């Protein structure tokens, strides 16, 4: 809120501020989608243009002074971490597209992990250390706008494939399935 308050105070004093930049040094665990969207909504109350700058999303969870830099080091990235990385980029760009009336630009810190200030082992950028596009690049580039605002109908009924008297799985008219999972504590 401090930056918002400062910019608002300046605008109220007559300073001609029309836009603001939001640095995007994130990781796969944060900030939350809700916090990112809330920040965009809040800033859009006082400016006409928001630029996302220095965007990178690293695969580790260090923040601030706890960042680990990894120049020259390489390690395999587990598939589930790659999935989280893609999901974070997908979620972020879904939010940015939703606010395209005010979010006018996205600038990455750099293109390739090799050139990242974080080092290649943090895998923060759309291209790998050899400048080859990673899955996150395709996630950003090849988005499906129909998936940005999916509404799932709540007309679920037991599947015709169920055992007699079995309630689950359920399916809806769009083809989505709902399962009930019993897991011990």
Protein language model regions, located:
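Short, electropositive alpha-helical surface patch
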Residues: 2-12, 120-129
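A short alpha-helix capping/helix-coil boundary motif
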Residues: 17-19, 71-73, 157, 168
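Hydrophobic/aromatic-rich, well-ordered segments within soluble, folded domains that form packed cores
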Residues: 17, 109-112, 176-183
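Insoluble glucan recognition modules
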Residues: 149-185
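Distinct, well-ordered alpha-helical segments
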Residues: 1-11, 31-40
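Aromatic-rich peripheral "rim/lid" segments of glycoside hydrolase catalytic domains that contact
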Residues: 31-51, 55-151
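A cross-domain feature marking catalytic cores of carbohydrate-active enzymes
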Residues: 1, 19-26, 52-55, 108-110
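Short helix-capping segments at alpha-helix termini
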Residues: 12-16, 99-101
């Amino acid at each position: 809120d401090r930056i918002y308050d400062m910019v608002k105070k300046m605008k109220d004093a007559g300073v001609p501020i029309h836009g603001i930049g939001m640095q995007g040094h994130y990781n796969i665990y944060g900030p939350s989608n809700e916090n990112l969207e809330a920040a965009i909504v809040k800033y859009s109350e006082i400016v006409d243009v928001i630029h996302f700058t220095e965007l990178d999303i690293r695969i580790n969870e260090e923040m601030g002074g706890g960042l680990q830099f990894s120049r020259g080091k390489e390690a395999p990235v587990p598939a589930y971490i790659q999935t989280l990385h893609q999901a974070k980029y997908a979620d972020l760009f879904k939010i940015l597209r939703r606010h395209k009336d005010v979010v006018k630009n996205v600038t990455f810190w750099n293109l390739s992990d090799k050139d990242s200030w974080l080092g290649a082992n943090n895998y923060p950028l759309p291209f790998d250390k050899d400048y080859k596009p990673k899955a996150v690049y395709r996630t950003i580039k090849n988005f499906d706008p129909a998936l940005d605002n999916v509404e799932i109908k709540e007309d679920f009924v037991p599947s015709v494939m169920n055992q007699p008297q079995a309630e689950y799985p359920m399916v809806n008219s769009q083809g989505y399935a709902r399962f009930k999972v019993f897991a011990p504590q």
